[in-house]
Regions:
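Conserved, well-structured interaction surfaces
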Residues: 42-60, 64, 82-158, 172-185, ...
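Long, intrinsically disordered, low-complexity segments
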Residues: 21-22, 82, 95-99, 112-113, ...
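An aromatic- and glycine-enriched ligand-binding surface/loop that stacks and positions planar moieties
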Residues: 23-84, 222-403
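C-terminal substrate/ligand-recognition segments
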Residues: 352-488
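Short coil/turn linking the two alpha-helices of tandem helical-hairpin repeats
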Residues: 155-156, 160-162, 202, 220-232, ...
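Acidic, glycine-rich segments characteristic of secretory precursors and extracytoplasmic regions
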Residues: 2, 10, 21-81, 88, ...
């Protein structure tokens, strides 16, 4: 909820036994009896509900946003900065304890239990207070939603976890993990409570609604019946799939897709048009207020997908080009899974051109000339001689050579599987969905964009997958084709047009006055990559025959060795999730729940392939939790710790 203070009265969850840096959001003074009593009042309940929203920000505020969700999968591999390399390579450093400069397993665990503890406190205080006002019932719904959402997040990563459903008044150290089945039961119950209590329409920016609960109910039910749970979920499948589809259809009936896929990423400033789209069901709220610049108070996801450009000729780092953390490098699976002639989503998701912003004393180049270009072409292309070409390729609009061009399939290495550009760890087309040009300086990490937690584009794919699991393949294509219809080029559309959050860098942006240089180009390498004549004709991506899927999908299916109709269609759904949701902090969970993680990582992520094992579809339980809990008043033995650890770890 924007422009509202974030309550400092978070109650530390007792399951977060490891040392947590609470100084960002825990005001020790509020552990006094006076303030505990205040939280029991109806006004205190309202204040505590604000803290629930602060917890949602965590998913965008730190490196865990990508470490837990996008590392070690098919879409991306590790980039030039290896801070989270172990999460991609599954090497010996990746386990219950992660050392070095890297995300730790306990970080997500601890933060989710902090939110759960706040939700537990609010739920108990409302019930004990006997409050029944409309506003307080909505706050109760928010607490049930967050508790269900946080447990869903934990189960998606770790499997069964300890279920804590009441607040703690004294320190507790004796816990055991509930089964995944029991956790799912609780998640469904909490989200159903939220669905009943939350308003149908948000009255405040970013408010949880009935549709948010329905979306995550559908997602939870789909997860419960997925392959990772096949050792116990048989009795749930029929009803869960029916209910999943019902909830998804309800959400779809209430939310329109953005007319143009690029509308989602056309960020021009806080609270701009792209943050108010009807497609967005729920988003963690951020803005340009730096007064609370700690903890979860700003969005850092703009940093992690960006490749190096400051070291290339006639270039230097600037605000719209972003600060290059280069944590995640785009994979060839991602390059090739799109129909790059007819599907606009690749070109609207990735930055393939940047302008000269540092010509120095050059008499040939000036600011605004095309300085860097990534050609994402197809195997067999012979137009470009090398993977990197300096001052060789001519830009047709100016007649000048382009200082730096990288080519996915150069003539001397242009067969499927050659992956020439992966020889460069620092240079690749950056995912541009989260770029933030509204920052104050080139080094500023403080992002201002909202973080999307649910949008109806995904809801369509949830519905499609539910139908695939019911064997209703043609019906599933209907939902997939709706997204593909939006992705196709429309009559008159400029296919080389590109927008991203760099567009927020303009006269009104905080950093514009002192940092006028600008690498932003509202243009992509569509024509240079595809090698076709300019056109404004419409395209079609409609799939009509499940036995004759698009060439991009058939290639993945062959690579993975699928033959059954079900495996082929589930593969299509997962491929479509890449095309629609690439980089949106969901991939690891999707591949883990469908037990396709290992096969896809081995096929499309050569760094992960060497170490990934079948048991790695579950994360290791944090060692800090195992070391901190007790049994019968004593620390756990090594054997007792292993009993609570996931298999293989």
């Amino acid at each position: 909820m924007k422009n509202k203070y974030i309550l400092n009265a978070l109650i530390l969850g007792t399951l977060s036994i490891s040392t947590i840096s609470c100084s960002d959001f825990l005001n020790e003074e509020l552990t006094t009896k006076r303030n505990t009593e205040y939280l029991k009042t109806e006004e205190g309940v309202a204040d505590l509900s604000v803290a629930l929203y602060e917890n949602l920000r965590y998913h965008f505020a730190r490196e865990n946003s990508v470490a837990f969700t996008q590392n070690g999968v098919d879409e991306f591999t590790v980039g030039g900065d290896g801070s989270n390399a172990s999460w991609n390579s599954y090497d010996g450093n990746y386990g219950p304890t992660v050392t070095s400069n890297s995300t730790k397993p306990e970080e997500l665990w601890d933060e989710m239990y902090v939110g759960i503890s706040n939700a537990n406190t609010l739920i108990q205080n409302v019930k004990e207070g006997g409050y029944t006002s409309v506003a307080t019932m909505e706050h109760l719904g928010e607490a049930y939603f967050l508790r269900g959402f946080n447990y869903y997040t934990l189960v998606a990563q770790f499997g069964g976890v300890p279920l804590k459903l009441t607040p703690s008044t004294t320190p507790q150290r004796e816990f055991t993990r509930a089964s995944a089945e029991d956790c799912y039961k609780q998640i469904v119950e909490d989200l159903k409570q939220a669905y009943t209590l939350l308003p149908a329409t948000a009255t405040k920016t970013g408010q949880m609604t009935k549709d948010a609960a329905a979306h995550f109910l559908a997602k939870t039910l789909l997860s419960r019946v997925s392959e990772r749970n096949d050792d116990w979920n048989a009795s749930y499948k029929e009803q869960d799939l029916k209910d999943c589809l019902t909830y998804a259809q309800e959400v779809i009936s209430h939310h329109a897709l953005a007319p143009n896929y690029s509308d989602l990423w056309n960020y021009t400033g806080p609270d701009g048009a792209n943050e108010k789209l009807d497609e967005i069901i729920l988003a963690a709220q951020f803005n340009a207020d730096k007064s609370g610049n700690t903890g979860n108070s700003y969005n850092q996801t703009h940093l992690y997908y960006i490749s190096i450009y400051k070291d290339l000729p006639y270039m230097k780092r600037d605000i719209p080009g972003e600060r290059e953390y280069q944590r995640l490098r785009t994979s060839y699976y991602t390059y090739d899974v799109y129909d790059k002639v007819n599907d606009s989503r690749f070109w609207k998701s990735f930055k393939t051109k940047a302008a000269v912003n540092n010509p120095k004393n050059s008499t040939y180049y000036k600011k605004g000339d095309l300085g860097v270009m990534y050609v994402i072409n197809k195997p067999g292309d012979t137009r470009y001689s090398n993977v990197r070409m300096n001052d060789e390729v001519v830009y047709s609009k100016t007649g000048k050579t382009i200082p730096t061009v990288f080519v996915a399939y150069p003539a001397n290495k242009n067969q499927a599987g050659d992956n020439a550009m992966l020889d460069f760890t620092q240079f690749y087309p950056s995912l541009s969905k989260f770029i933030d040009g509204y920052r104050e300086s080139v080094t500023d990490r403080v992002g201002t964009r909202d973080g999307i937690l649910a949008r109806v584009g995904e809801t369509y794919l949830i519905a499609a997958e539910a139908l695939v699991r019911q064997g209703k393949y043609q019906e599933a294509l209907g939902y997939i084709n709706t997204l593909r219809d939006r992705a196709a080029y429309k009559q008159g559309e400029d296919r080389e047009h590109h927008v991203d959050g760099g567009a927020a860098y303009k006269s009104g942006a905080p950093g514009y006055k002192d940092n006028g240089e600008n690498t932003y180009m509202a243009e992509c390498s569509y024509y240079e990559s595809n090698g076709i004549a300019e056109t404004t004709a419409p395209t079609s991506l409609k799939i009509t025959d499940i036995n004759n899927l698009p060439a991009e999908d058939e290639a993945v299916i062959r690579k993975l060795g699928y033959t059954s109709a079900y495996d082929r269609m589930l593969c299509l759904v997962l491929n479509e999730r890449t095309r629609e949701l690439c980089g949106e902090f969901q991939r690891w969970q999707d591949l883990a729940r469908t037990k396709t993680l290992v096969a896809r990582a081995r096929a499309f992520n050569s760094i992960a392939a060497a170490n990934i094992k079948d048991y790695m579809v579950l994360r290791p339980i944090p060692q800090t939790y195992l070391d901190g809990i007790q049994k019968n008043g004593h620390a756990l033995t090594a054997e007792e710790k292993q009993e609570q650890q996931n298999p293989g770890w």
